[in-house]
From Swiss-Prot:
InterPro entries named in the record: Gln-Leu-Gln_QLQ, GRF, WRC_dom
Intervals of motif Bipartite nuclear localization signal: 111-129, 147-154
GO biological process: developmental process; DNA-templated transcription; regulation of DNA-templated transcription
Domain WRC: 114-158
Protein name per its UniProtKB record: Growth-regulating factor 3
Family per record: Belongs to the GRF family.
Function comment: Transcription activator that plays a regulatory role in gibberellin-induced stem elongation.
Disulfide-linked positions: none
Lineage of producing organism: Eukaryota, Viridiplantae, Streptophyta, Embryophyta, Tracheophyta
Length: 387
């Protein structure tokens, strides 16, 4: 008869028990443990024989980065010798990925470099780009070079009179005077007012002596309406004018001693001849000019040249007056506002030659042919401008 619990005997059971393996020891258990240990040893040997995850250079770089991290944590500035290898590594990395150096951004550059330096850089903001060659000193071609500049307004030529060739300094002053009057477009009345010369090359005074200028019989100066100096200076363009004792002269004329000497000579001669040719007004109607006719030409020529302040021009233009009305209107507008009493002249000179002579004078300055005609009216001693 079989035993009921025979299956529970370890000797009867040759199969390994999956339920309680620890309760019994099978004869094959020792062999399995040895094989398991052998497998684990083989795995460990394979793990030990495997190469390390970092190379020696990578370990060195890792140590360097750890040192930089320690500097950053401590709040101490990182030395430059620790940052140079990192910069070189970034440069080598950029050259590895971008074979052409201009195609990449590169290290420490703010913008992308131009892949085609010699080509015009005008684009539409997308893929299109101008195919023309750029100018030598510009990054754009000739067509696109001035696109961004404001060129809506062109410069306006302010000079109204065409420049003329400068005559030699040895030419007579009368020829210079006639050329200056006839070529000036702002004063046709004076240019055509010569009595005997007309539009020719003679003096503008019509009958005056060479080297002098006097008002012609058909030309008078009327300065009734006040006009600014810009009416005369508008035809001069951008010339530099300066005030002098005998009118407004260009700056270029002041630097030439020969021209200045010729002008002074012409002015002095015309000043000597001025009273005899323009003194056609009635002296009796002006008490202050009672003894003007007594002064001879030598006394007038010996008068000193008084420096005057910058003057204003009165009158808008020069007009021609009929010969019938010439006797009553000659130079009268210049003396309408003179004081009638002698007490109004407190600071007259005590000189005998100047005691009865008014300080109000009329002088006409005649520059060269390339300059503009200028007229000055002097100022009286009490500060009143004559008109």
């Amino acid at each position: 008869m079989a035993m009921p619990f025979a299956s529970l005997s370890p000797a009867a059971d040759h199969r390994p028990s999956f339920i309680f393996p620890f309760c019994r020891s099978s004869p094959l258990s020792a062999v399995g443990e040895e094989a398991q240990q052998h497998m684990m040893g083989a795995r460990w040997a394979a793990a030990v024989a495997r190469p390390p995850p970092f190379t020696a250079a990578q370990y060195e770089e890792l140590e360097q980065q750890a040192l930089i991290y320690k500097y950053l944590v401590a709040g101490v500035p990182v030395p430059a010798d620790l940052l140079l290898p990192i910069r070189r590594g970034l440069d080598s990395l950029a050259s590895r990925f971008y074979h052409h150096p201009v195609l990449g951004y590169g290290s420490y550059f703010g913008k992308k470099l131009d892949p085609e330096p010699g080509r015009c850089r005008r684009t539409d903001g997308k893929k299109w780009r101008c195919s023309k060659e750029a100018a030598p000193d510009s990054k754009y071609c000739e067509r696109h070079m001035h696109r961004g500049r404001n060129r809506s307004r062109k410069p306006v030529e302010a000079q109204l009179v065409a420049p003329h060739s400068q005559p030699p300094a040895t030419a007579p002053a009368a020829a210079v005077t006639s050329t200056a009057f006839q070529n000036h477009s702002l004063y046709p009345a004076i240019a055509n007012g010569g009595g005997a010369n007309g539009g020719g090359g003679g003096g503008g005074g019509g009958g005056s002596a060479p080297g002098s200028f006097a008002l012609g019989s058909n030309t008078q100066l009327h300065m009734d309406n006040a006009a600014s100096y810009s009416t005369v200076a508008a035809g001069a363009g951008n010339k530099d004018f300066r005030y002098s004792a005998y009118g407004v002269r260009p700056l270029a004329d002041e630097h030439s001693p020969l021209i200045t000497g010729a002008m002074d000579t012409s002015i002095d001669n015309s000043w000597c001849l001025l009273p005899s040719q323009t003194s056609t007004f009635s002296v009796s109607s002006y008490p202050m000019l009672g003894n003007l006719s007594e002064l001879d030409q030598n006394t007038i020529c010996s008068l000193p040249k008084v420096e005057r302040e910058p003057l204003s021009f009165f009158g808008s233009d020069y007009v021609t007056v009929d010969s019938g009305k010439q006797e009553n209107q000659t130079l009268r507008p210049f003396f309408d506002e003179w004081p009638k009493a002698r007490d109004s002249w407190p600071d007259l000179a005590d000189d005998n030659s100047l005691a009865t002579f008014s300080a109000t004078q009329l002088s006409i300055s005649i520059p060269m042919a390339t300059s503009d005609f200028s007229t000055t009216s002097s100022r009286s001693h009490n500060g009143i401008y004559s008109r």
